Amino acid sequence: MTAVLTAPFIPIAKNLSSHRAAQGVIYADQLKQAGIDLYVNMSLDRYVEDHNTFDTMYVYHGNDWSGHLNLFGGLKEFPHVDNFLNFSKFKGKVYSLIIDFPDYYEQLKHKVDLANSKNKPIDPRWNQVDWNNIIRMQNEAETITPNLLKVYPNIAIGDSHAICMYRPEWINYSMPFKTLHGALKMGLHTFIKPCDHDFENVEFYFGNIDVRHHLLRQPDPVAATKELVREYTRQALGVAEMYNSTVTLYELLPIENEKRHIPKTGWYEKTPFYGSRVERDNIRRLFKEELKKYECSSLRVFEWVDGLINEHGELDFKYMEKPQSVHLSREFYPHWQGWEWNGLNPPINKPVKVHHASLESFI
């Protein structure tokens, strides 16, 4: 093993229910598809302290990098100082995934020096960080995009939920906070990076945010939903023709119980959602029914969520990321779960009770 994929601050969680870890593991799998043999440095028993065990490092900066560090607990109580300390000692070749290597030196070293000069309490391990080597890593790191390391015949595109669409031999583009309405204003075709080849399959998965926050704010939510789907399918058919491909549109996730805690990053207009659970689920089901009206040989609807619904008609918490937020746990992705990256064997499949819903409330 000569390469490692790691995160500089919070270690990649071994727990399959982590949305943040899932994106890192997907990058690892894409690197593997490109012929790179590597290990994902995870928490618990999957953690390798000496990063110099490896020759090459691929740095995952998280799926929510905003450009600024937010250390939970600050310099005094941040619980993962050891991980950054170990990270700082790596002497080999460094690749930065997706974004240019951030200037962690600039964002941290001054704060450490200032705290020391004022005798403010900090974790003493910050003073053991190899800051000169952090500068070297920043200056020498080469930025790469795993999606573009080889030519793939298939592409899946969507908002932050779209990472669940991943499987080997697929490009996977996930754009957090992107609504279907916003995607359509930009044009679905604009999300397919310029390529000199056609795609056999193109998939889109937008709309969950529209249902959660926007459609029920419209004067006529039913009419707004129908119009949104009409434009969605019109543009999807245009993509099918443009790339000589079959386009698949994903049905949306069921609605979870309203007691689910949603981090403020997922709020809009100071609320975690707009409309009751039943109202939003009615819109979700209408969305699916409208999608199916436009099915044809080049436009398909991927129906996949019935097994995630509990006896109350809700998206069951056990299928979701833990301990909070709105995404699925990787364990329940529809195509690929990547058990092997966690050193696990997939469980024997057990039948899941399917609950069918209706549109009675619209009749």
Regions found by a protein language model. Give the residues of each.
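Surface-exposed cleft-lining segments at the edges of enzyme active sites
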Residues: 11-17, 66-73, 176-185, 209-230, ...
